């Protein structure tokens, strides 16, 4: 059974009509299938899909990104890679099933694949914790990313999460620290890293694995610091103002490409990735091939600096960026006070004088 969003009512009615036309037993007695009418209805559906999906507002895009039938990380891993060997455990606490991770072959080359998995049924969604990673999940991926870096293996991550799991147990086990360490690990790697946002890219739960050389989004995916509902609730105490929040947050792929937060948009079939899985699979495959080839002849240091420059450039004014050729050499200028203090304590004579002053002050204070 197909699942429809609240703005797809017309499409739902047309597709129900087509299903009836395709089944001659639906009518009284036997009759021939009216292929002409089916063809006309299909054209009407295609036109309606084009009309709706070429004018999606940010909140509707959010609903498409969360669509129940949307391809998940496991689908891409199973169909894009060969000889996938899943690896488990963080070597500290346990296994987190909300993230799939392991080594595989892509175009006959070894890669590390990481995928935040939401699940596609009630049982699997509960098992996968709806794609919300726990600290042990991030520590598992850190362990594997360091291993990939050691053997010079590229890393491909599929991002699809509403956010990191905010439960009490996760917080007790150091959720914030695990996310911070994951970002630190991603930024320190000397191998090419690609992050593909296939659905929701929610807050720190996403950025922990998306601090990559290339951040790529499917056309109808979203990437934001908080959900529109959460933003509306915090700012206006009104969760119904989701459209207003979604517009202000600039969470769509087009907005983020314009802001240079992401590097590329992978086009989806009209109506969303779930309507033509073969096409979206082919588009993702081509994007991975193209982006991995870009780093083929680069050294580890060049790859590291490419990533560092990319994130240092985000949010900078054009004038500032144009004055610096290599942002990887950028450092904060120390204040005169900090420089004086640092240089003062380097001198043994200064330390001896300071010690003498402290002794004299102590003598006068206690003699009063």
Curated annotation (Swiss-Prot):
The keyword Transferase applies. One of its GO terms (cellular component) is acetyl-CoA carboxylase complex. It is found in: Cytoplasm. Residues 44-294 form the CoA carboxyltransferase C-terminal domain. Acetyl-CoA carboxylase is a heterohexamer composed of biotin carboxyl carrier protein (AccB), biotin carboxylase (AccC) and two subunits each of ACCase subunit alpha (AccA) and ACCase subunit beta (AccD). Component of the acetyl coenzyme A carboxylase (ACC) complex. First, biotin carboxylase catalyzes the carboxylation of biotin on its carrier protein (BCCP) and then the CO(2) group is transferred by the carboxyltransferase to acetyl-CoA to form malonyl-CoA. Belongs to the AccA family. HAMAP family: AcetylCoA_CT_alpha (MF_00823). This is Acetyl-coenzyme A carboxylase carboxyl transferase subunit alpha.
